[in-house]
Amino acid sequence: MSRRKQAKPQHFQSDPEVASLPRRDGDTEKGQPSRPTKSKDAHVCGRCCAEFFELSDLLLHKKSCTKNQLVLIVNESPASPAKTFPPGPSLNDPDDQMKDAANKADQEDCSDLSEPKGLDREESMEVEVPVATTTTTTTGGSGGSGGSTLSGVTNITTPSCHSGCSSGTSAITTSLPQLGDLTTLGNFSVINSNVIIENLQSTKVAVAQFSQEARCGGASGGKLLISTLMEQLLALQQQQIHQLQLIEQIRHQILLLASQSADLPAAPSIPSQGTLRTSANPLTTLSSHLSQQLAVAAGLAQSLASQSANISGVKQLPHVQLPQSSSGTSIVPPSGGTSPNMSIVTAAVPTPSSEKVASNAGASHVSSPAVSASSSPAFAISSLLSPESNPLLPQPTPANAVFPTPLPNIATTAEDLNSLSALAQQRKSKPPNVTAFEAKSTSDEAFFKHKCRFCAKVFGSDSALQIHLRSHTGERPFKCNICGNRFSTKGNLKVHFQRHKEKYPHIQMNPYPVPEHLDNVPTSTGIPYGMSIPSEKPVTSWLDTKPVLPTLTTSVGLPLPPTLPSLTPFIKTEEPAPIPISHSAASPQGSVKSDSGAPDLATRNPSGVPEEVEGSAVPPFGGKGEESNMASSAVPTAGNSTLNSPVADGGPGGTTFTNPLLPLMSEQFKAKFPFGGLLDSAQASETSKLQQLVENIDKKATDPNECIICHRVLSCQSALKMHYRTHTGERPFKCKICGRAFTTKGNLKTHYSVHRAMPPLRVQHSCPICQKKFTNAVVLQQHIRMHMGGQIPNTPVPDNYPESMESDTGSFDEKNFDDLDNFSDENMEECPEGSIPDTPKSADASQDSLSSSPLPLEMSSIAALENQMKMINAGLAEQLQASLKSVENGSMEGDVLTNDSSSVGGDMESQSAGSPAISESTSSMQALSPSNSTQEFHKSPGMEEKPQRVGPGEFANGLSPTPVNGGALDLTSSHAEKIIKEDSLGILFPFRDRGKFKNTACDICGKTFACQSALDIHYRSHTKERPFICTVCNRGFSTKGNLKQHMLTHQMRDLPSQLFEPSSNLGPNQNSAVIPANSLSSLIKTEVNGFVHVSPQDSKDAPTSHVPQGPLSSSATSPVLLPALPRRTPKQHYCNTCGKTFSSSSALQIHERTHTGEKPFACTICGRAFTTKGNLKVHMGTHMWNSTPARRGRRLSVDGPMTFLGGNPVKFPEMFQKDLAARSGSGDPSSFWNQYTAALSNGLAMKANEISVIQNGGIPPIPGSLGSGSSPISGLTGNVEKLGNSEPSAPLAGLEKMASSENGTNFRFTRFVEDSKEIVTS
């Protein structure tokens, strides 16, 4: 058709039909009034002014010419705006009448539901694909959809007639009910303007003008020439061949899936309200055939599409009931607007779907226009109803929704879901018989269109909404065809599939959704649907019982939107079956199943096949109301048969499946469409999927890398193995220096840096006894052990003194020695603090060793204390030396003293376990001579190696403190046998003769240690002895190493100047012995008690004669270098203690805790403290073993009743005592210790050493006589037995008291809770 522009185009009114045709002037509403035609034969195109002598030519031209959806339609009725065309055309002309009716209908529709119209158009287009396509141009709703049909039909009349025209047949054959009737029914107010601003779906146009008269005059439209309509329908049919093919495929599917298909085909008859004016013209026959096909497809499509369209359209329809139409076939027609909307296809469709609906729904369809709408081709009906349809209901073109490409279906599905939601909401407030679809504002619809009905989230597109919905339904439509894993999005599947590329390069990824229910459906090949290779996952047994589903036929494999299957589950669950309409058309089962109002069908769409049922039954589903109607009607009719016929069979008559299968089958069909037929997929049902997810929560412990205790899934077996250590407390990696154990080698390596930076050794690198210089701290420690072992004299050695000996004993001794040092607190903590059986040490060995040379271990306990005390008095340097000795061997400082003191200590300890310090000091004073110490050793066989041990042994006699962990000292030699080695060397170097000298077991708790020094230090955990006291703050420490480390916390200026003076002037034995004697005794006493203050008289007790003994004096004399001032000049983030620099203040702060021993983060469960919150969190994982899986995923709170764990620790007594003490001390083992039995066994519980630290750290010095059996300690510790029960609590309480009491000094209560880190409260 030429589009030549005439200089002076004229419209000849001579042809009233043409004159009456609305002129569509592009986007503007300029309807040019028809000019009087010069000749009645000439017809002018209102848009391009082209003249045609034949009306048919003009009509054909308009199809291509009138593409603009904005149509200016002149409303010739007085109510219409002034833009109405001149009255020239007579209404008598059939065309004019049709136009008038269409215009009126349009006006009403526009006035009431502008947007719904657009939706309706689209729907109608979809339904009446053949017709719609032709008219699409006019309507512009959805090209080639029902809407187009309407416009095509309307072209003659008006685009607004699209709804009526869509049902071209009905329009032609019968006069359509006036929309006015619907308006009255729907209580719609008619706007007097034929211009309506609405959001036309699938278009960019926002304004449409329709002739109200044309719409309203639809009743008279029946006079339209059938031939013209038929020609238009034919053209539309040709243009919509593809859609017809899709429809046909759907019909085949229905036939295959449901036995009801027979019913659907029966629908071909096209009853219409008025007698159909079918012309003999083959076009009529063709239209009827098309209508039949549509009826079949529409039956399904209507069930689905009309559900969606009708839901949207019906929703759009007010409470309109279609009284005019008979409950049966005229269901749709009843609405005045509806009839016109019903095209021939509509009329045809109404018969099967309408009749079914009518029969099933009965009057309900009438009562609910939605139902009737659904009964009529949902599309046409929707468009017809669109004026009344609810604009809020997003109306995906029903045809598109049902037949469109996957993408449209997806969008439609989302829209349908939304529509269903809207319907459900509307219906809630409407009478059951009345389909109340109230129009919502266009903005509301747009908003609601992409709004999640579960969480109310709004999305910018249907696809985004669809994907989001899967998060609620749990649907994962995309299946990996290699491993069977499912994904919610194709993108995720693509990413996952890359993993298989290497192993299966020849297998292509399946990009189509696979219904989830098919995963469990057995197939003839044994390979699950959607899988390229046999699945490793067994099929559920119940599914095995079901018939094998043959792969879907091509019809089944319609190129339906892959999303449909996924959507269907949503639809099923989310909305009544109607929502699934379009989607359900593709996979009706699913939709119907979940959404259908019918309890059976709707619920499970038991007739999994019921897609067809939906087709037939769906029609009833105009909205939820329709949905329910359809469910009821469809279920009874097609529904029942459908239920009986298995969808899987692929034939309507297929074997019936049990009801459970039907839903699955429906899902299968859904899946089938998307994936080259039916692809298997997991159950698509929302509820079933959610149910599976819930059920699987407790079944997921099958992951090979999942922790069976806390159900945490690790990345690999090695990670899992390390993770288990957090539960078991296993620490296989031990520090050779301090004996601390770690769960990973990396942590151990990190820990070694602490030793490298350890100020006491690193800064000095000189032997505190002989002042020999060493470049390696480890070598120095070994060297010190040699001193303690007697291999090297305890007198200052020339610088050139050979280090070979030191080296000899070094490694082994050093290891233990170091272990002793750091072990004392941290390591012991790691060891369980439990059983501490008394293990007598061989006294003989002790004696021998003592006599030959002071037993470093024994000495370390009490002697070391005395020596240290003396040294402290003499100078901090000496004290540090003693500390080193004591730390390494327990207290190696004064061998002689150690022997004596240990023996004495043993006595004193036995005297009063409560105040080991006092007893120790007394002991040391009493027995400085090796003989005494030897005797002491004899006293407690366990003390054999170390006199110190005697103290512990005696403590063991009197005290049975709470279990103390061996801590790092816990180098536990696997051999606990007590072998008394009388060799002084054996005693001195238990490490070397470990095999021979194995009596390194604790007499109290039975723990074995790698060396005597470790054992001696361990004993202090029982005795609470803290022989090493800080001269600055009077804090006591169990090992010299700890004291040295603590000294680093004091600024050099804080230390007494005497400490820096090497008391070398004093005779190695003489002076140091004398001076320290007094001070030492007092200090020792104080230290033992954990109190700095000691009465001078106590110091007097210490006989100077004892002090003179070489080893002691030498050690005392040998000046110990205090932590040297930082070698490096201060820098930013510079540690003043060790001179180490850090990149950040936080790192420095954490580092400083290694010097201060501060451990601000304590475990609220077991009380262990940590230097960093991260360590605490890791530690908290050790308690997970005692928690139920329910706690999984919950963050363990670092905060707890023990608020003191915070940066500003609260007083221990209140918090810790109440909590820990209450539990451990209360005697309710089940509440505290028992629950940590496993942990304790693995060193997770508090170590005795920790406890001792706590006691000592927090105990302010209280003056007491050396000989007095009672002391603050005694008060706190009582006896070992007491300690066992009350140690955690009593000491704390006492500590608090003491801390707040006498000592004017501010005592920091230190609790080495973990890894020798302290928690400090002041």
Curated annotation (Swiss-Prot):
A zinc finger (C2H2-type) spans 43-65, 450-472, 478-500, 705-727, 733-755, 765-787, 1000-1022, 1028-1050, 1133-1155, 1161-1183. Its main location: nucleus. Disruption phenotype: Death at P1 stage. Newborns have either no kidneys or ureters, only one kidney or ureter, or two small kidneys. The remnant kidneys have disorganized cortical structure, shrunken glomeruli, necrotic proximal tubules and multiple cysts. At day 11.5, embryos have an incomplete ureteric bud outgrowth, fail to form tubules in the mesenchyme and show apoptosis of the mesenchyme. May associate with NuRD histone deacetylase complex (HDAC). Interacts with components of HDAC complex including HDAC1, HDAC2, RBBP4, RBPP7, MTA1 and MTA2. Interacts with CCNQ. Interacts with NSD2 (via PHD-type zinc fingers 1, 2 and 3). Expressed in the metanephric mesenchyme surrounding ureteric bud. The gene is Sall1. There is a cross-link at residues 440, 672, 689, 700, 946, 981, 1085, 1218, 1297, 1317 (Glycyl lysine isopeptide (Lys-Gly) (interchain with G-Cter in SUMO2)). The lineage of its organism: Eukaryota, Metazoa, Chordata, Craniata, Vertebrata. It is found in: Nucleus. The modification Phosphoserine is found at residues 591, 594, 596, 940. Residues 22-41, 96-107, 114-124, 936-948 have a biased composition (Basic and acidic residues). SUPFAM superfamilies: beta-beta-alpha zinc fingers. It holds the Pfam family zf-C2H2. Residues 1-41, 78-128, 578-659, 789-855, 891-961, 1094-1119 are annotated as: Disordered. Transcriptional repressor involved in organogenesis. Plays an essential role in ureteric bud invasion during kidney development. This is Sal-like protein 1.
